[in-house]
Amino acid sequence: MKKIVFVLVLMLSSFGAFGQETVSGQFSDALSTPITAEVYKQACDPPLPPAEVSSDWDCCDVCCNPACAGC
């Protein structure tokens, strides 16, 4: 019984420590959001269509298209 309680406590404590929703007080984390947003913006700017335009170019070559969940 003690082992089960220990495992449950360990799981709950690690969930909070490794979760993505945790807030860090480090200064470097404050800068990560604008940098990430800028990289995302640059990565999602649609390039010029290729010389041979295919019918699915709008979907699979532009990463910000919400219709392209798998691309």
Curated annotation (Swiss-Prot):
Pfam families: Enterotoxin_ST. Residues 1-19 form the signal peptide. InterPro entries: Heat-stable_enterotox_CS, Heat-stable_enterotox_STa. Its main location: secreted. It is found in: Secreted. Induction: In cultured cells, expressed only at temperatures <30 degrees Celsius. Under conditions of high osmolarity and alkaline pH (as it is the case in the host's intestine), it is expressed at 37 degrees Celsius. It comes from the Bacteria. Residues 20-53 form a propeptide. Disulfide bonds join C59-C64, C60-C68, C63-C71. GO terms for molecular function: toxin activity. One of its GO terms (cellular component) is extracellular space. Keywords: Disulfide bond, Enterotoxin, Secreted, Signal, Toxin, Virulence. Belongs to the heat-stable enterotoxin family. Transcription reached a maximum at the entry to the stationary phase and significantly varied in different Y.enterocolitica strains. Toxin which activates the particulate form of guanylate cyclase and increases cyclic GMP levels within the host intestinal epithelial cells. This is Heat-stable enterotoxin A.
